[in-house]
Amino acid sequence: ISAVKEMTVRDALNSA
């Protein structure tokens, strides 16, 4: 998993 994708997934989970 790329760092950018990890940040995106983390942001999505954080928003949820």
Swiss-Prot record:
GO molecular function: pyruvate dehydrogenase (acetyl-transferring) activity
Keywords: Mitochondrion, Oxidoreductase, Phosphoprotein, Pyruvate, Thiamine pyrophosphate
Major subcellular location class: mitochondrion
Places the protein is found: Mitochondrion matrix
Cofactor: thiamine diphosphate
Task of the protein: The pyruvate dehydrogenase complex catalyzes the overall conversion of pyruvate to acetyl-CoA and CO(2). It contains multiple copies of three enzymatic components: pyruvate dehydrogenase (E1), dihydrolipoamide acetyltransferase (E2) and lipoamide dehydrogenase (E3).
Quaternary structure and interacting proteins, as annotated: Tetramer of 2 alpha and 2 beta subunits.
Protein name as annotated: Pyruvate dehydrogenase E1 component subunit beta, mitochondrial
